[in-house]
């Protein structure tokens, strides 16, 4: 029996018991690094949206989105406990490390999921709550349980889950979905493949050991490198769309263009990387830059908004 077929067996033998997990262990179950990116992009969507929202309601909205993202992470770790135990990158996560039992993680994730969606609906609006519920479902069921272990396109399709937060933040203010919020979605959606395939290149051994069909393992390094360049180009183009569509300034557009060129440059370095190169430094550099890129793009959008709607409205001169 393979690890994938046996994922339910992890930690399920013997008499049911409770773990002695600490608050820190449960916090790690929420994938705080991923949550920080989710919270930041959701906050950007909330701020950039036209209209006003009560600061307290806005805080509740961001908190609910953060809790929903954490719930998704907990459910992902519950389902993936079998492969997490084998992969070097994930072996120290709370479940494979024996700090939290799988059934505890499942209950924790389901409880937080329901709480975040219900409170967001009651306190903000039900469209935002529905989008949050769909995001959790998409990440846990569509990506984690289905796509991740069945197709090398897992990241391409599954990346939608990570792209919804700014759209949810936008819906919290406006109660709707617009072209602008779809553009914010697309920036993250198109960014995701290059980001994760860079990781998959230098973690091929881990993914191969557990049978997860990542692009490099199934289609080879050469195909993966070409696909990374394609998605880097698409990401760079999506990054300047806010200016092209008129909801960001030329200053932002110039900054996004420079960032996009950097993304493309790093992707081309990966393309030129010899297959015999076991260190894969270009892939590691692209992975690191891609994280900085996304934070920089959404930070620039926020700064651009503040200049246009706060400082200039107050009588500043640019």
Curated annotation (Swiss-Prot):
GO cellular component: a single term: plasma membrane
Highest rank taxon of the organism: Bacteria
A molecular-function term among this protein's GO annotations: protoheme IX farnesyltransferase activity
Alphabetized UniProt keyword annotations: Cell inner membrane, Cell membrane, Heme biosynthesis, Membrane, Transferase, Transmembrane, Transmembrane helix
Membrane topology: Multi-pass membrane protein
GO BP terms in the entry: heme O biosynthetic process
Miscellaneous remark of the record: Carbon 2 of the heme B porphyrin ring is defined according to the Fischer nomenclature.
Annotated family: Belongs to the UbiA prenyltransferase family. Protoheme IX farnesyltransferase subfamily.
Purpose: Converts heme B (protoheme IX) to heme O by substitution of the vinyl group on carbon 2 of heme B porphyrin ring with a hydroxyethyl farnesyl side group.
UniProt-recorded name of the protein: Protoheme IX farnesyltransferase
């Amino acid at each position: 029996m393979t690890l994938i077929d046996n994922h339910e067996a992890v930690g399920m033998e013997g008499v049911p018991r409770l773990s002695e997990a600490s608050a820190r262990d449960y916090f790690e179950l929420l994938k705080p690094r991923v949550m920080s990116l989710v919270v930041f992009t959701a906050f950007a969507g909330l701020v950039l949206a036209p209209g006003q929202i009560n600061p307290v309601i806005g805080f509740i909205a961001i908190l609910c989105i953060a809790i929903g993202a954490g719930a998704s992470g907990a459910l992902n770790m519950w389902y993936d406990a079998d492969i997490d135990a084998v992969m070097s990158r994930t072996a120290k996560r709370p479940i494979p490390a024996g700090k939290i039992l799988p059934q505890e993680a499942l209950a924790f994730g389901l409880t937080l999921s329901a709480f975040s969606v219900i409170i967001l609906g009651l306190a903000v609006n039900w469209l935002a709550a529905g989008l949050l519920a769909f995001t959790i479902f998409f990440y846990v069921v569509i990506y984690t349980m289905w796509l991740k272990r069945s197709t090398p396109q897992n990241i391409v399709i599954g990346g939608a889950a990570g792209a919804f937060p700014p759209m949810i933040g936008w819906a919290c203010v406006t109660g709707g979905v617009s072209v602008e919020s779809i553009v914010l979605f697309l920036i993250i959606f198109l960014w995701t493949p290059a980001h994760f395939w860079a990781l998959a290149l230098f973690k091929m051994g881990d993914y191969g050991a557990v049978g997860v069909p990542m692009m490099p393992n199934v289609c080879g390094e050469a195909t993966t490198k070409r696909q990374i360049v394609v998605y880097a180009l698409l990401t760079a183009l999506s990054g300047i769309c806010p200016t092209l569509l008129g909801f960001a300034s030329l200053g932002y557009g110039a900054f996004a263009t420079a960032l996009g060129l950097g993304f493309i440059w790093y992707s081309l370095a990966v393309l030129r990387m010899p297959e015999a190169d076991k260190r894969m430094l270009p892939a590691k550099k692209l992975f690191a830059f891609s994280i900085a890129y996304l934070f920089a793009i959404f930070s620039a959008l926020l700064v651009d908004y503040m200049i246009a709607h706060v400082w200039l409205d107050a009588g500043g001169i640019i």
